[in-house]
């Protein structure tokens, strides 16, 4: 294992091989930290956050016993991006109209008018 923090950064997901202590990341190869939607592009309800965390746990468990590599972290991050997209398309997640930049990165909102 490496002495530096491995990370995966996607548009809405950041995963680090670190733990958070006093708002700082401390390298820990036995721990993964998930930073969900750091730009606050979406409005998150606890139930939806729970679904993303559950999927994250499932993905991490599926890599149990395998090398923790940049590639595997990117695969987990990409899968979580897909989960976010599914939640958005199902109407369980909504864009945050107060977001700094509202760019509809996961596609236009689905409304009855647009369907």
From Swiss-Prot:
This is NAD(P)H-quinone oxidoreductase subunit M. InterPro entries: NdhM. It is found in: Cellular thylakoid membrane. It comes from the Bacteria. It comes from Prochlorococcus marinus (strain MIT 9211). NDH-1 shuttles electrons from an unknown electron donor, via FMN and iron-sulfur (Fe-S) centers, to quinones in the respiratory and/or the photosynthetic chain. The immediate electron acceptor for the enzyme in this species is believed to be plastoquinone. Couples the redox reaction to proton translocation, and thus conserves the redox energy in a proton gradient. Cyanobacterial NDH-1 also plays a role in inorganic carbon-concentration. NDH-1 can be composed of about 15 different subunits; different subcomplexes with different compositions have been identified which probably have different functions. Belongs to the complex I NdhM subunit family. The lineage of its organism: Bacteria, Bacillati, Cyanobacteriota, Cyanophyceae, Synechococcales. Transmembrane segments: none annotated. Pfam families: NdhM (PF10664). GO terms for cellular component: plasma membrane-derived thylakoid membrane. Its EC number is 7.1.1.-. Its main location: membrane.
């Amino acid at each position: 294992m490496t002495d530096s923090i491995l990370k995966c950064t996607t548009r809405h997901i950041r995963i680090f091989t670190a733990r958070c202590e006093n708002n700082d990341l401390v390298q820990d190869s036995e721990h993964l930290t998930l930073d969900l939607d750091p730009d606050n592009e979406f409005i998150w309800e606890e139930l939806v956050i729970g679904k993303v965390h559950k999927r994250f746990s499932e993905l991490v468990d599926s890599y149990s016993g395998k090398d923790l590599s940049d590639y595997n972290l990117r695969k987990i991050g990409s899968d979580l991006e897909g989960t976010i997209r599914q939640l958005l398309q199902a109407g369980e997640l909504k864009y945050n109209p107060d977001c700094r930049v509202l760019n509809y990165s996961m596609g236009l909102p689905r409304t009855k008018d647009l369907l």
